[in-house]
Amino acid sequence: MIIVTGGAGMIGSNIVAALNAEGHDDILVVDDLTDGHKIANLADLSIADYLDKDDFLTRIEAGALGRIEAVFHQGACSTTTEWNGKFMMEVNFAYSKRLLHACQAPRVPFLYASSASVYGGGSEFREEPALERPLNVYAYSKKLFDDYVRRTVFDTDHSQVAGLRYFNVYGPREAHKGAMASVAFHLFNQVERGENPRLFGAYDGFGPGEQSRDFIHVGDVADVNLWLWKRGSSGIFNCGTGRAQPFRAIAETVIDTLGKGEIEFIPFPDHLKGSYQSFTQADMSRLRAAGYNGQFRTVETGVRDYVEWLKAQRSS
């Protein structure tokens, strides 16, 4: 059995889809379906079972789930604007620690979601503690778990443990995320409503729409997860493309693909000032050194593919 926590979420469901494509369907999805809209992400996928996240943790700690091939731990509170630190630490840190230890004794491969948000406002994006400066409680919860893994696992005899620091992920199966869905998703919907796509104006030394991130298609993220599992590599790895591109490039690709719209700039929101990453670009040296030679989609290619997927979903 393969377990995917957060399996009804964006990245988790795309990992399930990638596993299905390789012939795996003995998959246990773990999630919190209080928001039942996430079921749409699983409707076209093949899984063997589902467990609520709390029931699952009790059962795996008791050794009651039988033979497990791997755990892809994608479940988390990923709302970067959430400032309830108690809730965030319980969900992202305490839960992850318990699951990590439940996987160690039976030597179950454990691949988990970290985040590029741990780098905060820094200008270098390598997997080194000195470069990690989280700007919000979400980022801190992710950094703290990475530090815990470094301190308690990597210097011991351990089963595979791999953390993937996701940069800006976009692509299919993210509609349930609402405000936290990708910029590509929101710009597509704005244009489809007959509005102009809106981007932030000048901020933090960047011109209008020129704030830049390392945008990675969720299909490429799923590919990296499966490759690492098969490779058996342990460590903390950046998961981006290695190339920063401006938000303007996303808007231009949406406009070009849909054949309508004109970029409109809005003032940078006050509530994001001081906790916003204006630039990210993954240093991919560690993942490449581990042997990964897969290619990553550019914004122009990946966003075009995504917009076509969204159009097909609308018409179906």
From Swiss-Prot:
Annotated active site: Y138 (proton acceptor), K177 (proton acceptor)
- For the keyword Protease, the answer is no
Catalysis: reaction(s): ADP-D-glycero-beta-D-manno-heptose = ADP-L-glycero-beta-D-manno-heptose
Q: Which cofactor does it need?
A: NADP(+)
Associated pathway = Nucleotide-sugar biosynthesis; ADP-L-glycero-beta-D-manno-heptose biosynthesis; ADP-L-glycero-beta-D-manno-heptose from D-glycero-beta-D-manno-heptose 7-phosphate: step 4/4
The cofactor remark states: Binds 1 NADP(+) per subunit.
Q: Quote the Pfam families the UniProt record gives.
A: Epimerase (PF01370)
Q: State any single GO MF term.
A: ADP-glyceromanno-heptose 6-epimerase activity
> What EC designation does it have?
5.1.3.20
Enzyme class, one word?
isomerase
- Record keywords, A-Z: Carbohydrate metabolism, Isomerase, NADP
InterPro entries in the record, alphabetically? Epimerase_deHydtase, Heptose_epim, NAD(P)-bd_dom_sf
Residue sites binding substrate per the record: N168, A179, H186, F200, G201, A202, Y203, R213, Y276
HAMAP family (UniProt xref):
Heptose_epimerase
Outline what the protein does: Catalyzes the interconversion between ADP-D-glycero-beta-D-manno-heptose and ADP-L-glycero-beta-D-manno-heptose via an epimerization at carbon 6 of the heptose.
- State the family it belongs to: Belongs to the NAD(P)-dependent epimerase/dehydratase family. HldD subfamily.
Spell out the PANTHER family in the cross-references.
ADP-L-GLYCERO-D-MANNO-HEPTOSE-6-EPIMERASE, NUCLEOSIDE-DIPHOSPHATE-SUGAR EPIMERASE
According to the UniProt entry, the note on domains is: Contains a large N-terminal NADP-binding domain, and a smaller C-terminal substrate-binding domain.
Q: What is this protein called?
A: ADP-L-glycero-D-manno-heptose-6-epimerase
Species for this entry: Mesorhizobium japonicum (strain LMG 29417 / CECT 9101 / MAFF 303099)
Organism classification? Bacteria, Pseudomonadati, Pseudomonadota, Alphaproteobacteria, Hyphomicrobiales
